[in-house]
Design a protein with these regions (language model features):
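Conserved C-terminal beta-signal and adjacent last beta-strands/turns
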Residues: 5, 16, 195, 347-371, ...
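Acidic, small-polar-rich N-terminal luminal/periplasmic segments of exported/outer-membrane proteins
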Residues: 35-173, 515
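Outer-membrane beta-barrel translocator/receptor signature
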Residues: 115-117, 129, 138-147, 152-219, ...
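Outer-membrane beta-barrel domain signature, strongest for Gram-negative TonB-dependent receptors
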Residues: 223, 229-368, 376, 526-528
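Structural signature of Gram-negative outer-membrane beta-barrels, strongest in the C-terminal barrel
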Residues: 239-243, 358-361, 365, 373-375, ...
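Surface-exposed extracellular loop regions of Gram-negative outer-membrane beta-barrel proteins
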Residues: 256-269, 376-383, 438, 442-450, ...
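Outer membrane beta-barrel strand-and-loop segments of large Gram-negative receptors
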Residues: 339-360, 397-401, 502-506, 512, ...
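Gram-negative outer-membrane beta-barrel transporters
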Residues: 367-371, 410-414, 533-535, 564-661, ...
């Protein structure tokens, strides 16, 4: 057992499981039982149309509802346990905000003026911000994780990849699904879905979910645990088929997320010694002395309308999405046992998007998809009393896109695609001198007489992204080679409090090559391989400087000593990276499924220009693990008149670097800048019993069962102080469900 849990043995096992499928067809004739154990076909929409996963020349991993439930994939942030070269976490300082990195290209901030590197789409609607991108996996039909730039079909801000989530649709029949989960930290998670018919040609679906829990961090100052989460979502969806060729689906979501973030740890150096951090470290990070809580609230509603019409061998689709929500964040301790650097942030956000799409469904050699996309996103934020500012940010983008695939014969095909995007942004930002003390004084400080800065920067850009693929099919699968480009929008840094800090920066671009194999060597094996090589230019990188730095202009040595800094976003970097991804499935029998995934990544800065000085030899890419892997097994047996399904998944992620002011980084004086490598064993036992009245379900689960306590999941620095966020490790629970 010790060898199995070592770092090298599981890697060898992952490769062995995948390779067994490839070699098996060459050396061993599968037995009759294995012949019947066909791997279920998975249909994906990675190219904006329904296709078999094994036919798509894109690096995509698809997770089914059963995999999500039995694999303890409870929220968006758990997906990385089963997908190679993906790193996901929740950013607690923003409500339900997703920190996502795919193939070493990540985004870990909360500002609406900054663009993510990994896109998240729900029911065909692209989320313009990472706020709200951490959500529950209940009532989900499929999850697709597309790795690598997806600039042609998904557009801007997908240079790392896309997480594409599709929820279930109204069935048009009577149906009910109820589920309750109880777990550690007094967690209760209650969910339900009701389906009902709407006349002869339609259906209505009503859904609700509420989760409440206490913090996984014990507070040594309060001698207890804080409340952690109280989140409620209500959804209503209506589907109506006006004809056999025309269908309309409308979905409305109302949500209210109240989060008291798990207490952080002050890492240093200001304002206190590392006493609390060291004590927590010695106790498996179970404790924190944080005096005041980090409160994050988010409430609002989403609307989605989709109209589909089929005619003359084509599908015409219109998708509209509206997200309208408010956020509040309050923090004044940052993991410390004292009060300092109080921050209160109130923010409004609204996005509206429209997409018109036409796709062909021809038996002939040519198939295509084309469309028009429009997005408008507006936000307004007020922040203080330290570094008080207000920002109004507006963004507008439109794009035309198209992609066609031509089959020369049964073996060879080529795909060509392009997307033209035009966008405009503007920002009105005002800042005032810091107000220390009573937060109500902020109102008195919003006086033009004491205005510190007023700026109205503007940004416009257009970009052409494209993709070319050549594909060769064979009896057991296919191979492909692709070249694709993508870009991440330029813009402004809205936390800036000086004119230099809010100057516009340009868009970031990527060129990527992929070579892939998709194969089913036998009827009970599947082996997928992908090699990628990417070059990123004009990278948008953060620069944190002392106040005395010439480009900052906020003061001299006295201001430096007070911890005053400047924060910039600038196009100062170039990066190259390559890696390999392996995914394999083997079904030795009809009741046993083995899975494995492996991701390698070699990524480094080619250049990182800091005021004429190249710091590429010092700086490291954030959240870019060199190695990720997982192995899993699922066994199904008949027991007590029902099915018993045993599932286990063991995953590993290498160490990663965190946000650090690399230009002034000194290993002798700076706090630790890495997150240690970590592994997790998740297990579950699911019992299903079908009766004439429906299906009853009981799930016993454990996540990260081999490790007690918590672990550091993120480290953040402002230039003057650093704090760490803690993620839970070992958790146990039970789920009870019923559906018909």
């Amino acid at each position: 057992m010790r060898d199995f849990l070592s770092r090298k043995s599981p890697i060898a096992l992952a490769i062995t499981i995948a390779a067994t499928g490839a070699v098996g067809s060459l050396t061993i004739a599968p037995n009759a039982q294995a012949q019947e154990s066909l791997i279920e076909e998975v249909v994906v929409t990675a190219r904006k149309r329904q296709e078999s996963l094994q036919d798509v020349p894109v690096a995509v991993t698809a997770l089914t509802p059963n995999q999500l439930e039995r694999g303890s994939i409870q929220r968006t942030t758990d997906i990385d346990k089963m997908v190679p070269n993906v790193e996901l976490h929740q950013t607690y300082i923003g409500s339900e905000s997703l920190s996502a990195s795919i193939r070493g290209i990540g985004f870990d901030d909360i500002e609406k003026s900054l663009e993510p590197t990994v896109g998240v789409a729900v029911d065909g609607v692209f989320m313009a911000s990472n706020s709200g991108a951490v959500f529950d996996m209940f009532d989900v039909e499929s999850v697709e994780v597309l790795r690598g730039p997806q600039g042609t079909l998904f557009g801007r801000n997908t240079i790392g990849g896309v997480i594409n989530v599709t929820r279930t649709k109204p069935t048009g029949e009577w149906g009910l699904k109820l589920q309750a989960t109880f777990g550690d930290q007094d967690m209760t998670d209650v969910k339900g879905v009701l389906n009902m018919p709407l006349g002869q040609n339609g259906g209505v679906k009503l859904a609700f979910k509420n989760i409440q829990s206490d913090s996984h961090v014990y507070n040594t100052t309060l001698n207890g645990r804080r409340d952690f989460r109280d989140s409620t979502t209500l959804s209503a969806s209506i589907r109506y088929d006006f004809t056999e060729n025309t269908s309309v689906i409308f979905t409305y979501d109302d949500y209210d997320h109240d989060t008291i973030a798990p207490d952080n740890l002050m890492v240093g150096p200001f304002p206190e010694p590392l006493t609390g951090y060291l004590a927590s470290q010695n106790d498996d990070y179970k404790t924190s002395p944080q005096l005041n809580p980090l409160e994050a609230y988010m409430w609002g509603d989403n609307s989605t309308l989709q109209i589909t019409h089929n005619a003359a061998g084509h599908q015409f689709k219109y998708t509209m999405g509206i997200m309208d929500y408010e956020e509040e964040v309050h923090e004044s301790s940052w993991g410390s046992s004292t009060v300092f650097f109080p921050v209160n942030r109130d923010q409004d956000f609204k996005q509206t998007s429209h997409e018109l799409q036409i796709s062909s469904d021809s038996d002939g050699p040519l198939n295509y998809v084309a469309g028009f996309y429009y997005l408008e996103a507006d936000s307004f934020i007020t922040s203080g009393p330290i570094q008080p500012f207000t920002v109004n940010h507006e963004a507008e983008a439109q794009a035309f896109y198209g992609e066609m695939t031509y089959d020369f014969n049964d073996n060879w095909s080529v795909t060509l695609g392009a997307r033209y995007t035009d966008e405009d942004k503007n920002m009105q930002t005002y800042s005032w001198p810091p107000v220390v003390g009573d937060p109500d004084r902020i109102a008195n400080n919003l006086d033009p007489a004491v205005l510190q800065m007023a700026a109205t920067p503007e940004f416009s850009d257009d970009n052409l992204t494209y993709r070319a693929v050549i594909q060769r099919n064979f009896s057991k699968g296919m191979v492909y080679a692709s070249y694709s480009t993508g870009f991440r929008s330029g813009g402004f840094f809205n936390r800036g409090t000086s004119p230099a800090e809010v100057e516009p920066y340009d868009s970031e671009e990527v060129d990527s090559i992929e070579i892939g194999l998709r194969s089913n060597p036998t009827e009970n094996t599947q082996l997928n391989l992908t090699y990628f090589n990417s070059e990123y230019t004009d990278m948008q990188l953060p620069l944190i400087t002392p106040a005395s730095f010439p480009e900052c202009g906020k003061g001299g040595a006295e201001e430096d000593a007070a911890g005053i800094t400047c924060s910039f976003i600038a196009n100062v970097g170039e990066t190259s990276m390559d890696g390999l991804e392996v995914e394999g499935i083997w079904m030795p029998t009809s009741t046993l499924t083995l899975r494995a995934a492996l991701g390698t990544l070699d990524a480094s800065y080619d250049s990182y220009d800091y005021a004429g000085r190249d710091i590429a030899n010092v700086a490291q890419l954030l959240y870019a693990p060199e190695l990720t892997w997982s192995v899993g097994a699922e066994h199904i047996s008949q027991m007590f008149g029902g099915e018993l399904i045993l599932t286990a998944n063991y995953s590993f992620q290498d160490e990663v670097f965190t946000q650090t002011p690399w230009a002034i980084y000194d290993p002798a004086t700076f706090p630790k800048i890495t997150i240690d490598d970590w592994e997790s064993l998740d297990i579950s036992a699911t019992y299903l019993r079908d009766t004439e009245n429906g299906t009853f379900k009981v799930i016993l689960y454990g996540t990260d069962v081999l490790e007690d306590g918590n672990r550091v999941q993120r480290r953040y620095t402002t230039g003057s102080f650093t704090w760490a966020e803690l993620a839970p490790r070992q958790q146990f629970g039970i789920t009870i469900g019923y559906e018909f």
